[in-house]
Each structure stands twice: as C-alpha cells, then as structure tokens.
UniProtKB/Swiss-Prot annotation:
It is found in: Nucleus. A motif (Required for homo- and heterodimerization) lies at residues 269-272. This is Protein SHI RELATED SEQUENCE 5. It comes from Arabidopsis thaliana. One of its GO terms (cellular component) is nucleus.
Length: 346
C-alpha cells in the first residue's frame, strides 16, 4: 500500500516578517511550501526501490497547473532537488552485497539537468525496476524503452546471432578441430616412421661394412641340437691347446659316496678367457661321446677348410687374424653355470 509521510521543512518566516509587500509575502508563502519534503513509499508497484524522497511539486502539480502555465513566460520555475537510492535486486533478496544506484535530478532557474551516480553495479529501470541498460540515456530496460517509443541506439544493437549463422559457425569449428586432430595424427605417424627408418639405416650401416665377416660368424652349429647362435665377435669353432687339471668334486653334504672327479680348464678364445669344469659323462660308447674332447677325430678333418673361410672373410675386411680362430673346438667344452673349484694343494 502506498503512503505519504510528512518530513517537514525549514521555516523562513523569521527572516521575512518585516516585509510589507503583498506579492513578496505570497512568494514567501510559496517558497515555504516548496521547502516541505514528503517521504513516498510505494509497496505495490516499486517493490525494489525502497524509500524515495520527492519534493511537493509532484503532489501539487494538478493544483498549481494553471498558475504554472500563466507564469511560464513571466518567471522561471521554482528550484527543487530530488534524489533516490535504488537497489539492483528485489526487496525480498537478503544479499548484503547488492549494488545500489544513486541518482540526482536538479532543476535550476535557467537550465534543467540531471546526472546519475552509479556505485558497484548497473542502474535500475525507472519504470519496472529491472536491470537497465548500461549505456541507455533514458535509464530504462529494453522492454520499457521500446514500449515508451524512445529512439535508443543502445537497445537497437543486439548480440543475438541467427540460428543459421550459429550452425554454420559450429560446423566450421568442428571441421577445424577434426582437421587439427588428423594433422596431429599424421605428424605422429610420420615421426614414428622416421624413427624406425633411422634405426633400420643404422643397422644397414653397421652390417654393410662387415658383410662377409657377419656371414662367416653367424653360423648355427649343425652338430648340436641346442640351436644356439654363435656371437658375432667369436669364431664358430676353435682348436686350441689347453691344460686340464683333475679335481675332486662333491655335494654340499660332503658325503664320501657322492664324491666324483672332473677336469678344470681355462682357454683364451678371441681375447676372452673361458673357464669351466668338465664332468664325467660316462663311457665313451654312449650317444654323447662327441661331447668329449678326446673324441675329436671328426673335427680335425675340417681344420683347413674352416681356416680358409675365416682367413678369406678377415682379409676382405682388413682385420687382424686371431690365431686361435684357425682351430676348431667343441662348443660344449664346458657347461655354463657350473661351480669353479681350485686345484687341490699338494
């Protein structure tokens, strides 16, 4: 419910009691009435504007309308000041951080004018109280400005984009994202191919210079069933003199019945020392007699042929010939992983 609250004004009768002219008293009486202020509260239409202070000219407009029309050209209108504080939100909002807009309207004797001071946020519409456009000179929202017929350039501009343009823009963005993803995948695949190609080139470079030596050294022993490949830096077969020492081996429990005899040796092959122990494999007539170093009659016939092949491969590469590589030797001269025992002391 709307209501008026009288606030009162200053009385200037003490300053003008001595004036005798009737016109002066009339003007003085009008000036006293203009000094009265009324507090206007509108709880129905302007819920979010709170209390506003207005001069009595707004409420006495119909009463003095004829007098103002008669005195329009004779004298200037009376001075009045109006101000109000408008919160940006509704009155039901309990947020203490609401921005408020303080506006003043000043009408002087010569030129009317107005200005608005905004603090911590935008202004409210003067008609509906909603958020007003920031650059609107009429301080109204888009709907009220349009309904009143104001030619506001701020409300003409709009950031709304048609649906067709929005779809076109989204399609362009999707195509760009797909293109960028495909280009990244292509670059990654190219890098992987370059990396694998570089490794293959390195292998070709390493194998190109020593082609004949690699062909001679990477030979699988046909006599053995293990199928192991010989190292690139070691000859496939070696014949070298060696000293075998007879040693006594036993189990961990050191049982006398489990004691046996074996031979320990160490040979130099290709600049590497190979040590091991040869265990007793049984009588010579068994199937594994070729593992014994004493039965080497079959391998001695291939000494000249193996030496010729090795010398030919080494001469092509310009490498120094290792004398130990000219003689074949059994690949199973020792068993890897066997313990090493020192010769018994005498």
């Amino acid at each position: 419910m709307a209501g008026f609250f009288y606030l009162g004004g200053r009385d200037n009768n003490s300053n003008n009691n001595k004036q005798d002219h009737h016109q002066v008293d009339k003007d003085h009486h009008h000036q006293d009435k203009s000094n009265y202020l009324y507090l206007y509260k509108d709880e129905i239409y302007n819920n979010n504007k709170g209390f506003e202070i207005w001069p009595p000219q707004y409420f006495q407009q119909q009463e003095h309308q004829q007098q103002q029309q008669q005195q329009q050209h004779a004298s200037a209108p009376a001075n009045f000041y109006s101000f109000g504080m408008v919160p940006s939100g509704s009155s039901s909002n309990n947020n203490n951080n609401r921005s408020r807009s303080l506006y003043f309207n000043v009408v002087s004797d010569h030129e009317p004018g107005g200005f608005t001071v905004t603090r911590q946020g935008g202004m409210n519409c003067q008609d509906c109280g909603n958020q007003a456009k920031k650059d609107c000179p009429h301080m109204r929202c888009r709907t009220c400005c349009k309904s009143r017929g104001f030619h506001c350039q701020t409300h003409v501009k709009s950031t709304w984009v048609p649906a067709a343009k929005r779809r076109e823009r989204l399609a362009q963005l999707a195509s760009l994202q797909h293109h960028s993803a495909s280009s990244r995948e292509t670059q990654n695949a190219k890098r992987l191919r370059e990396a694998s190609g570089g490794d293959n080139n390195d292998d070709k470079d390493h194998s190109g210079g020593g082609g004949s030596a690699l062909a001679n050294t990477r030979v699988v022993n046909a006599n053995s069933n293990s199928g192991l490949e010989v190292s690139q830096h070691l000859p496939p077969e070696v014949n070298s003199p060696a000293i075998f020492r007879c040693v006594r081996v036993s189990s961990i429990e050191e049982d006398e019945d489990d004691q046996a005899y074996a031979y320990q040796t160490a040979v130099n092959i290709g600049g590497h020392i190979f040590k091991g122990i040869l265990y007793d494999q049984g009588p010579e007539h068994q199937d594994n007699h070729h593992l014994n170093l004493l039965a080497s009659t079959a391998t001695t016939t291939n000494v000249e042929e193996t030496a010729t092949k090795t010398v030919t491969g080494n001469n092509n590469n310009g490498l120094m010939l290792d004398p130990s590589s000219l003689y074949p030797a059994q690949l199973n001269s020792f068993i890897a992983g066997t313990p090493f025992f020192t010769p018994p002391r005498s």
